[in-house]
């Protein structure tokens, strides 16, 4: 059995893309009129990282941002600062993985 979840960019609503991390914070401009309210990240050049999810209901703020790893049964982690709000998208902080290529899906 298989299941497929397909995502697409819809201008001003959602953004699909990729980003290369280098150890420095990076702003991901999604073209939103306000910051992202949902962010899904997955590393593509390594199997060591899972599916990371942040959402505004749990809190995407400057400071600690709760996240879930979808591929585990673990509880929400609440004591990390891996992403921050950015006027038209989100910022991946330098506290997150220091390298790698990541795909993302963000919703305004």
Predicted segment positions?
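Surface-exposed molecular-recognition determinants
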Residues: 1-108
